[in-house]
Amino acid sequence: MKVYVDADACPVKDIIIKESGKQNIAVTLVTSLSHYSLHEHPSHVETIYVDTGADAADYRIMQLANKGDIIVTQDYGLASLALAKGCYVLHHKGFAYTNHNIDQLLQSRYLSAKERKSGKRTKGPKALTEEDRINFNQLFLQYITK
């Protein structure tokens, strides 16, 4: 099992790195070159930089991931592809994407995009709370200790 992180806007990288290190699980952070950093991570963490294109990180994660790996993303499209590949997919707010909830999430995304295209404003995501971080930590631990 490996953990792949859609890392450009992931607010729980610290939790992922800490908890996976305790379990000796490899983590790959996939991020765009626009987020290049000299920050050093522990030896179980690899950072892969991709072009700044809209879905470049998603494509790279799908290229690397195998059935049974964990992917952390807030991107519903990537989540859908990863589920079809047999990966476990987690959102940083502490819920797992499943074959039971992904269609509703994709439909919601589509309707919001349709409203924005017609000139309406839609609400953005709520800010990450401490409760969200706790929920993610608990969920992540469940998956890496299976």
From Swiss-Prot:
HAMAP family (UniProt xref): UPF0178
Protein name as it appears in the record: UPF0178 protein OB0454
Homology family: Belongs to the UPF0178 family.
Top-rank taxon, per record: Bacteria
